[in-house]
Regions:
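N-proximal low-complexity "stem/linker" segments adjacent to membrane-targeting elements
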Residues: 1-60
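Acidic donor-binding segment of Leloir-type glycosyltransferases
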Residues: 57-99
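Active-site acidic Asp-centered loop
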Residues: 73, 125-127
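Glycine-rich, basic loop-to-helix element that forms the pyrophosphate-binding segment
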Residues: 100-117
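Conserved catalytic core of nucleotide-sugar-dependent glycosyltransferases
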Residues: 115, 125, 134-204
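Short aromatic/hydrophobic "clamp" motif used to bind/position activated sugar donors
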Residues: 122
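Active-site donor/metal-binding and catalytic loop motifs
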Residues: 158-159, 228-266
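Acidic donor-binding loop at a coil-to-helix junction in glycosyltransferase catalytic cores
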Residues: 208-214
């Protein structure tokens, strides 16, 4: 049964109050865990700079043991990337690398990476988002506590890159609601039991809606999805050839708070 100190929070909850509730929840959940299961991180990338950033974030993760299945979509590893991977290896993080051509879809890439994974859980991470050091461990904590087949984060923090603003969106409803059963979580935070994800067809073979493919497949098979708090993850919105053009007003109008730049707090990894 899940432990829920956060479920009494509402849109008037301050950031310090949110952090306090999260820390209490972590303490409760981790006091019950004797051993962590194996986790395979799935990462598809086609941007060298973003790969550098996410490799640094993986190196900072507090989850003691995990491995990385890395898909290079039309790019090559630089000397700097290789040094980062060597640092992961020294941390006993096994890194499996596969190259993919331009014509291969995102769904095909992620499904291929998932099929090569060995962990009891798979964790999808996106190269253009921001992850705090407790990210993976928080997700596993929630999975073990709730028994959910899939766990992921709410969309509470969004970085609007063209505006250089991070907005905090917190409400007891919609995509901002936390610590509850749901049919949706942020795609860049999906943690799923490997066998359940495989039965759902992994991420399909399309170029879009790959996260929804997985989540729908899980629920259609009778699996349950738990959405935990968003703090510790920042979803990045920008204008590029591979992301949707977004009306930023929906994020600004729904914001409880906003800060210039990327939110600077240890839960997000500190200053970037």
């Amino acid at each position: 049964m899940a432990s829920n100190p956060i479920n009494t929070m509402d849109r008037f909850t301050s950031f310090p109050q949110e952090i306090q509730a999260i820390e209490a929840l972590r303490k409760t959940r981790r006091s019950k865990i004797k051993k962590y299961p194996t986790v395979s991180v799935l990462l598809s990338t086609l941007r060298a700079d973003d790969l550098s950033n996410v490799l640094d974030q993986l190196l900072a993760q507090t989850l003691v043991t995990f491995d990385l299945v890395l898909g290079l979509h039309t790019i090559e590893l630089s000397a700097s990337h290789k040094r980062q991977i060597a640092a992961l290896n020294r941390r006993k993080v096994k890194v499996v690398i596969q190259k993919f051509t331009k014509d291969q879809t995102l769904g095909t890439i992620l499904s291929t990476l998932a099929s090569q994974s060995s962990g009891k859980y798979i964790a999808k991470m996106d190269d253009d988002d921001y992850y705090g050091p407790e990210h993976l461990r928080d997700l596993v904590d929630a999975a073990l506590d709730t028994g959910a087949e899939v766990v992921g984060r709410a969309m509470n923090y969004v970085y609007l890159e063209p505006l250089q603003l991070t907005v905090r969106r917190f409400a007891p409803h919609g995509t901002q609601a936390v610590e509850l059963w749901s049919d949706w979580v942020c795609g860049g935070t999906i943690l799923a039991q490997r066998d359940v994800a495989e039965a759902a067809g992994w991420f399909g073979d399309g170029n879009t809606a790959v996260d929804r493919f997985m989540l729908s497949g899980v629920t259609n098979n009778g699996g349950k999805i738990w959405r935990t708090f968003g703090a510790g993850y920042i979803y990045r919105r920008t204008f590029t050839f591979h992301t949707y053009v977004t009306n930023y007003s929906k994020y600004l109008n729904g914001a409880n708070e906003q800060v210039v730049g990327i939110w600077d707090h240890p839960i997000f990894g500190g200053e970037r």
